[in-house]
């Protein structure tokens, strides 16, 4: 991943923090305001989809993919995880997560993973425990139910 893409990812997360912390009143009429207002908690779908769109708008060749993970009770017990469902972005072969720190077991505010770090490990463990990871296109208007 290029330094410029990394810079844009970090800048985007900073913009989400700013919007949620000091400008949320300006976003109140936005359809997904409830998600943004709780950032980073419960807004992985919003953050991932909006990041993917932002990256694609800046460079149409990137083609980011949204990955929705769902864990099992066995996974949560075995790994003492608080994750039930989570959404991340894959771009240029890298996993990107702006909200992983919403879960007690993770502290990093931005995770950019070449598949050998925490996100790659998380996906392998979810699959190994019978959970799912579904790839989909960018969906700005939808949210997780």
Give the location of each predicted region.
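A structural boundary/capping signal
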Residues: 1-145
């Amino acid at each position: 991943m290029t330094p410029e893409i990394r810079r844009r990812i970090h800048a985007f997360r900073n913009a989400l923090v700013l919007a949620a912390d000091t400008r949320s009143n300006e976003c109140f009429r936005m359809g997904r305001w409830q998600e943004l207002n709780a950032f980073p908690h419960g807004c992985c779908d919003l953050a991932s989809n909006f990041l993917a769109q932002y990256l694609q708008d800046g460079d149409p060749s990137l083609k980011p993919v949204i990955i929705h993970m769902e864990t099992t009770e066995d996974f949560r017990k075995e790994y003492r995880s608080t994750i039930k469902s989570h959404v991340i972005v894959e771009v240029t072969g890298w996993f990107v997560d702006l909200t992983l720190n919403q879960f007690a077991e993770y502290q990093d505010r931005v995770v950019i993973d070449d598949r050998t770090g925490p996100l790659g490990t998380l996906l392998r463990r979810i699959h190994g425990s019978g959970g799912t990871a579904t790839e989909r296109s960018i969906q700005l208007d939808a949210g997780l139910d």
